[in-house]
C-alpha cells in the first residue's frame, strides 16, 4: 500500500519515516511554497455548532475508561470501528473514538476529575505519604507517591495514588524538593503531614540526612514508618544464613531445570502421571520460581517442592542416566538426603508470619506486651527453651521421629532451626521503629478498651504528637470522658466491632439527639494517628502497574499520560470498583469539549501533566495523517 503526495505528484511508501523525509525534502518545500494558501472560513464562523449529546459523551468516556483499565490506547482504533459496525440502531452507530481522542479523554476528562476529587477528599485533614523511587524500562527514574487519609464520604481509611514525578537524581535534597513543590502545586498543606512510609533506603529514611530528616524540619512531629514487609524480608534473609546454603540452590535449580526445556517438563509430567495414577491421584502442577527480592514468599515454593518430593526424586534418578548432567546428579543427591527434607519442612512451618512472630519457644513471662516480651528475651539465653523442647510443627516432628538419620545429625538440624528463630528475633528487635511507643499504646484506643467505664487516663493516650498547635486540649479530654457514657451496644444494635478502623469512623459520625457531632474533634485526632502506614506495598503495586503499562513496545509514553493512566487505575483499585460500575460525573461530561480536550497545553490531572510531551502529539497527528492517506487509496 502506497501514499500519494498531491503537491509533488509522487507516490510514497505509507511509512512514517518516509513521509517525514519527504516533507523535509527540497522538492516538497518548493512546491508547497507556490501553493495558494487562502484560508477559508470555518463552519463555526457561520454559526454552525457541532453538538454531542450527553449520551454520546458517556459512551466515549466509558469506553476510554475501559481502555485505560484493560488495554493499550492504540487498540481503541479497531475496537471503536468494530463497535460502530455492530451497534447499528444504537448510540454506538455514530461512535467516533480513536487513539487521539481517547488519549485526550483520559488525560483531560477522566483523570483530572478523579484527581480533583482526591485532593478535595483530603482537604485540610491529616494524611501520611508513602514514597519510593524506581527506574522503568526506558531508564527513566520516577518518584512515586501514595497517600493514606480518612475519607469522610466513604467513612473509611483509604490509601490512594497521589502522583509520579520524573527525577534526575535520587538524592535526599532532590527528592525532598520534588515532594514539597508537588504538594504545594496540588494544594495539599505540608503541615498536615502525619507520617512518611518508606522501604528503608538510606536516602529516604536515613538517620542523619534523608528525605525524612529534611521533611521533619518542616513538620516537627513527623513520624517515620519503615515498611514492615521489607523489614521482615531483611530479618528472614539474615536468619537464613543459619541454615545450609544448599537449600537455596536446591529450590532454585529445580525450577531452572524445567524452565529452560519443554522436553524435560514433558518427561517429568509422564513420570508424575505414572506415579499418581488412580482416582485419588494429585493433579500435576508446575514448580514455582523463588523470588530474589521477597524472601518471605518462599512458602508456596517449598510447599510445592515437598508435595512432589517422591516424583522429583524419581525423575532426577532417570535424568542422571539419560543426560549425564552434573546439575542433575547434584539435585538427585540433595533430594535423596533426608536432612534437606527436614530443613524444608521446618521452613514451611516457620514461614507463617504468625508462627514466626509468636514466641511459642520462649518461657512464660508476665509481660502483657507480646512484642516487648520478645525484645526483652532475645538478649537473654535463659529465656529460651532447650533446643530439644522447641516445637517446629507436627509434620516436622513426625518426619523427624521416622527418619533414619543419626542422632548427631538430628541434633544438628534442631540446633540450626533454633538458631534461625533466634537470629530472626534478634534482627527484628533491631529493626523496630523508633516511635514504637505509639504503636504499643494504640491498643488503648481499641473499642474493647475505650468503651469501658474504668479506662486509662487521657494524658496517657498516644495522641500528644498529633494535636494541632492551637487546639484546646480540654475539649479532647472532655470528649474522651464522655465516650464511655454512650451505650454502644444499643447504637450498633448488637456487639461493638472490635476493629479500630471500623469503630472510630463511626465515632466520627456519631451525633446526639440534637444532631450535634459530640466526638468529632477527638475522632479526628485518632483517625489522624491511624493514617500512619505500616508498609509501602501500595507503592510497589503502583510500580507493578507502571511496568504493565510502560513496556518495551510502549516505551515512549509521556509522563503526563503515565500519570493519568496510573491515577485512574489506582483510584479504582483503592475504592474497590470496576469499570463496569463506573458512571461519568457531571463534571466529566462538562469537560468533554474541545476547549478542555485539545486546546489545553497544560494537563489538569496533576502537576506532572504540565510536562506534556509535544512530540507525542506530533507523532499522533502523523499517525492520523497516514491513516487518512491509506483510507483514500
Language-model region placement:
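Alpha-helical structural modules in large enzymes and assemblies
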Residues: 1-633
Amino acid at each position: 500500500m502506497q501514499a500519494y503526495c498531491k503537491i509533488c505528484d509522487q507516490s510514497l511508501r505509507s511509512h512514517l519515516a518516509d513521509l517525514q523525509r519527504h516533507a523535509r525534502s527540497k522538492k516538497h518545500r518548493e512546491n508547497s511554497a507556490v501553493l495558494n494558501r487562502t484560508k477559508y472560513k470555518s463552519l463555526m464562523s457561520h454559526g454552525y455548532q457541532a453538538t454531542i449529546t450527553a449520551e454520546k459523551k458517556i459512551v466515549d468516556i466509558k469506553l476510554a475508561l475501559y481502555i485505560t483499565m484493560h488495554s493499550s490506547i492504540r487498540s481503541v482504533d479497531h475496537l471503536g470501528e468494530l463497535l460502530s459496525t455492530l451497534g447499528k440502531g444504537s448510540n454506538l452507530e455514530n461512535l467516533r473514538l480513536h487513539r487521539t481522542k481517547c488519549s485526550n479523554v483520559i488525560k483531560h476528562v477522566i483523570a483530572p476529575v478523579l484527581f480533583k476529587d482526591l485532593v478535595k477528599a483530603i482537604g485540610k485533614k491529616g494524611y501520611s505519604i508513602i514514597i519510593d523511587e524506581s527506574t522503568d524500562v526506558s531508564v527513566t527514574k520516577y518518584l512515586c507517591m501514595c497517600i493514606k487519609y480518612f475519607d469522610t464520604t466513604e467513612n473509611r481509611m483509604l490509601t490512594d495514588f497521589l502522583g509520579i514525578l520524573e527525577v534526575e537524581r535520587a538524592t535526599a535534597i532532590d527528592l525532598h524538593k520534588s515532594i514539597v513543590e508537588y504538594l504545594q502545586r496540588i494544594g495539599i498543606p505540608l503541615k498536615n503531614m502525619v507520617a512518611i512510609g518508606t522501604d528503608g533506603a538510606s536516602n529516604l529514611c536515613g538517620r542523619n540526612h534523608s528525605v525524612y530528616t529534611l521533611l521533619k524540619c518542616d513538620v516537627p512531629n513527623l513520624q517515620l514508618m519503615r515498611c514492615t514487609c521489607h523489614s521482615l524480608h531483611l530479618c528472614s534473609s539474615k536468619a537464613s544464613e543459619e541454615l545450609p546454603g544448599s537449600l537455596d540452590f536446591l529450590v532454585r535449580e529445580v525450577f531452572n531445570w524445567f524452565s529452560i526445556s519443554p522436553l524435560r517438563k514433558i518427561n517429568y509430567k509422564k513420570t508424575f502421571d505414572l506415579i499418581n495414577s488412580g482416582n485419588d491421584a494429585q493433579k500435576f502442577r508446575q514448580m514455582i520460581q523463588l523470588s530474589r527480592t521477597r524472601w518471605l514468599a518462599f512458602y508456596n515454593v517449598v510447599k510445592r517442592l515437598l508435595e512432589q518430593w517422591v516424583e522429583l526424586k524419581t525423575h532426577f534418578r532417570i535424568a542422571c542416566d539419560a543426560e549425564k548432567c552434573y546439575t542433575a546428579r547434584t539435585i538427585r543427591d540433595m533430594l535423596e538426603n533426608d536432612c534437606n527434607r527436614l530443613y524444608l519442612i521446618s521452613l514451611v512451618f516457620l514461614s507463617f508470619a504468625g508462627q514466626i512472630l509468636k514466641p511459642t519457644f520462649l518461657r512464660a513471662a508476665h509481660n502483657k506486651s507480646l512484642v516487648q516480651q520478645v525484645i526483652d528475651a532475645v538478649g537473654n539465653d535463659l529465656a529460651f527453651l532447650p533446643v530439644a523442647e522447641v516445637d517446629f510443627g507436627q509434620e516436622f516432628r513426625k518426619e523427624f521421629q521416622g527418619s533414619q538419620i543419626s542422632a548427631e545429625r538430628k541434633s544438628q538440624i534442631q540446633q540450626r532451626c533454633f538458631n534461625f528463630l533466634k537470629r530472626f528475633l534478634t534482627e527484628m528487635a533491631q529493626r523496630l521503629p523508633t516511635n514504637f511507643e505509639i504503636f504499643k499504646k494504640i491498643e488503648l484506643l481499641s473499642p474493647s478498651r475505650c468503651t469501658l467505664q474504668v479506662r486509662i487516663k487521657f494524658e496517657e493516650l498516644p495522641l500528644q504528637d498529633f494535636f494541632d498547635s492551637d487546639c484546646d486540649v480540654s475539649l479532647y479530654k472532655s470528649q474522651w470522658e464522655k465516650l464511655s457514657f454512650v451505650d454502644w451496644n444499643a447504637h450498633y444494635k448488637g456487639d461493638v466491632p472490635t476493629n479500630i478502623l471500623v469503630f472510630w469512623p463511626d465515632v466520627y459520625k456519631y451525633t446526639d439527639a440534637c444532631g450535634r457531632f459530640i466526638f468529632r474533634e477527638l475522632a479526628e485526632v485518632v483517625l489522624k494517628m491511624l493514617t500512619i502506614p505500616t508498609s509501602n506495598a501500595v507503592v510497589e503495586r503502583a510500580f507493578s502497574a507502571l511496568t504493565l503499562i510502560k513496556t518495551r513496545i510502549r516505551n515512549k509514553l509521556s509522563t503526563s499520560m503515565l500519570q493519568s493512566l496510573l491515577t485512574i487505575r489506582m483510584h479504582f483499585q483503592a475504592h474497590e470498583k470496576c469499570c463496569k460500575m463506573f458512571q461519568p460525573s457531571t463534571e466529566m461530561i462538562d469537560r468533554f469539549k474541545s476547549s478542555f480536550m485539545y486546546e489545553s497545553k497544560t494537563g489538569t490531572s496533576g502537576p506532572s501533566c504540565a510536562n506534556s510531551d509535544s512530540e507525542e502529539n506530533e507523532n499522533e497527528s502523523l499517525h492520523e495523517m497516514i491513516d487518512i492517506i491509506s483510507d483514500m487509496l
